[in-house]
Structure formats: C-alpha cells, structure tokens
C-alpha cells in the first residue's frame, strides 16, 4: 500500500508543475487501446518537461531487450502480469509493483496472458524512439 501511495504522490508532484497553467484530463484507457490493434506497444506521453517525462504505456506481448544511457526509469504497474528482465535477472510484474530501472541497465518486459499497462516515470525528457537496442 505504501508503494501505491508513493507512486501516486510521485505522479502528483511531477504532474503538478506541468499542469499549473490549466487542467487537462486524459482518458488513458481509451488512448492505450492501440496495443491490441496490430501494435506491439503504445506509449502515451502525459507530462513532458526538460527534466522528466511521465508516460502511460500499454504492451500487448513484449518490449524487447534494450537500455537507456541517458537516465533511469521507474515503472508503476497498473494492470496485467508479466516478467521484466533486468541484466538477466527476472522480476515478476503485477498491479501495484513499482520497478526501478537504473540508467544503462539492459531490460525487457514479457507480458503474460493479454495486455499490461504501466506508468513510466523517466528521469529525463524521453523519446521512446531513442532507446538503444542491445
């Protein structure tokens, strides 16, 4: 429960300054449905500043092994189950799990039985097209 509260608090703190000018509402569930329609994953930017990015992500089957050399990621699993592999070490993923992926660590995600959604808190401004393949 503390992890959920921590993740929600972190999201609130990060999102607060980005939305200070005006309120915005995202229907994340509706936006992320593309992960079941011929796309392996959908990455929806929620907040983007020069210092950090917050994305909602839906994964249909897997995110192949890759790494980020420009900053760390913290994932909060919202729905679905699967396994993350960080430097050849498996980590079970299910709703409520918070996973820290340090800068430069090779990682992948394999979804089990459907689709997984998570919130990705990124230490830097993030472009998903710039991930380095292993």
Cite the ranges covered by each PLM segment.
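A short, N-terminal "cap"/entry segment at the start of jelly-roll beta-barrel domains
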Residues: 3-4, 16-56, 130-134
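Hydrophobic core
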Residues: 9-17
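Short histidine-centered beta-strand/loop micro-motifs
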Residues: 46, 64-69, 110-111
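Conserved short histidine dyad/triad with adjacent acidic residue
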Residues: 53-69
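Short, conserved beta-strand element in jelly-roll/cupin
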Residues: 59, 70-84
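Structural motif
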Residues: 62, 81-83, 90, 106, ...
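Short acidic-glycine-tyrosine-enriched beta hairpin
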Residues: 89-103
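Ligand-binding loop in jelly-roll beta-barrel domains
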Residues: 103-129
């Amino acid at each position: 429960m503390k992890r959920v509260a921590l993740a929600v608090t972190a999201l609130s703190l990060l999102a607060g300054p980005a939305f200070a000018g005006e309120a915005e509402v995202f229907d994340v569930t509706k936006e992320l449905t593309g992960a079941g329609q011929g796309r392996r994953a959908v990455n929806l930017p929620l907040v983007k500043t020069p210092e950090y990015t917050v994305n909602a992500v839906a994964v249909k089957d897997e995110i192949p092994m890759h790494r980020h050399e420009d900053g760390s990621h913290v994932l909060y699993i919202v729905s679905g189950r699967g396994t993350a592999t960080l430097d050849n070490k498996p980590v079970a993923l299910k709703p409520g799990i918070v996973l820290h992926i340090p800068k430069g660590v090779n990682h992948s995600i394999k979804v089990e039985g459907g689709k997984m959604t998570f919130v990705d808190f990124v230490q830097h401004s993030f472009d998903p097209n710039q991930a380095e393949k292993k």
